[in-house]
């Protein structure tokens, strides 16, 4: 656990060293993001059973690639498992020409995700390191396990710029590519048709209240059933599965983020870009409330998380430009950025601790695939390992 805390602490240190100049240069920031990517990508099947599922499908694709006349669509289970998401299947095929090893495959996928994240933060955030810290609190740990959806999300985030640039077909192209990786990317499509303007606080509160009301009524299952062509039955059951109760965590997260944003509403400049990011962040809150009775429906809000990452970090920059005199501006800046860092750490630590409970300890102790063997105990390995040759030699393929 302490290694993860150390990683977060290092990012805080970098931020404190670069805060006065607005973050790192693009080159240094890229290097930092790649270090985070390697930390995730080199880990030895950490994050849960999803990695084993993707790894087994990839190994099958790699085996087919070695045949004389590969027939991927009929011989590879990945195309039958996700028939509507062939983009991910063909990406597996492409990577199989580079490696047949599942660990290298996961590393390549992770690097792709973080390269796309780097591009998004560079485009949308005023302070790249602070934005990365906020990302760490909200989404970092999901890059360990939800590889396919995170790939779709990181691609979809590239389309945000085409909303405020009003480039419809470029936006559609990005969404279609993301959709081919994970069909849930379709949830980002409606944002293009929301005018890129500032809405009144009262209007925002009304919309959030309506989403909360609909969420309490359990409307999410109905919405998914209406889009049966876009989401397979299994995904509907997973994402809209309800235990019959309200997920209080969704409400707290949505209410807290909405409160911070609305408290600083006037601080954010009234530009197309800032308004789009602002609206995206508020829609993140709205989706959490809409799926407040859903076991995993909150995962749809991840497509809007870049709005929260950019807006919250940008507010810190904008607050430093307000007030009378340098001292007041710096006090305003320091108080908010300290609060934002503490909030990000709380969210980060909450997931870190939560994913270590229940006997699985899917994140720690940390281990890379650079050494053979597996962690003991490791219930995920015991239940989902499909090829024990990897345990004896990580690079045997």
Features from the language model and the residues they span:
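Terminal, non-globular segments
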Residues: 1-397
């Amino acid at each position: 656990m302490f290694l993860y805390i150390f990683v977060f602490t290092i990012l805080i240190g970098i931020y404190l060293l670069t805060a006065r100049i607005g973050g790192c240069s693009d080159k240094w920031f890229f290097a930092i993001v790649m270090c985070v990517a390697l930390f995730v990508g080199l880990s030895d099947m950490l994050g849960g059973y999803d990695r084993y599922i993707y790894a087994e499908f990839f190994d099958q694709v790699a085996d087919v690639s070695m045949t004389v006349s590969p027939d991927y669509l009929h011989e590879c289970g990945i195309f039958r498992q996700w028939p509507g998401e062939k983009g991910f299947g063909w990406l597996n095929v492409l990577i199989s020409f580079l490696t047949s090893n599942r660990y290298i495959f996961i590393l390549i996928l992770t690097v792709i995700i973080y390269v796309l994240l780097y591009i998004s933060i560079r485009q949308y955030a005023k302070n790249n390191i602070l934005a990365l810290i906020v990302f760490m609190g909200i989404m970092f740990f999901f890059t360990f396990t939800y590889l396919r959806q995170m790939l779709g999300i990181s691609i979809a985030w590239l389309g945000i710029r085409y909303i405020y640039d009003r480039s419809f077909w470029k936006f559609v192209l990005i969404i279609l590519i993301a959709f081919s990786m994970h069909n849930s990317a379709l949830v980002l499509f409606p944002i293009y048709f929301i005018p890129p303007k500032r809405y009144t606080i009262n209007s925002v509160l009304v919309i959030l209240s309506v989403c909360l009301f609909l969420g309490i009524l359990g409307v999410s299952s109905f919405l998914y059933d209406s889009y049966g062509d876009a989401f397979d039955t299994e995904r509907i059951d997973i994402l809209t599965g309800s235990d019959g109760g309200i997920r209080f965590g969704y409400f707290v997260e949505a209410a807290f983020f909405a409160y911070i944003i609305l408290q600083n509403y006037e601080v954010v400049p009234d530009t197309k870009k800032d308004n789009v990011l602002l609206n995206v962040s508020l829609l993140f809150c709205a989706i959490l409330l809409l799926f407040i009775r859903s076991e995993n429906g909150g995962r749809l809000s991840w497509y809007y998380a870049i709005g929260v990452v950019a807006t919250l970090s940008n507010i810190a920059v904008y607050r430093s430009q307000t007030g009378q005199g340098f001292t007041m501006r710096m006090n305003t800046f320091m108080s908010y950025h300290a609060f934002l860092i503490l909030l990000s750490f709380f969210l980060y630590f909450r997931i870190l601790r939560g994913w270590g409970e229940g006997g699985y300890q899917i994140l720690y102790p940390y281990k890379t695939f650079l050494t053979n063997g597996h962690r003991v105990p490791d219930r995920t390995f015991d239940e989902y390992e499909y090829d024990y040759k990897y345990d004896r030699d990580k690079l045997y393929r």
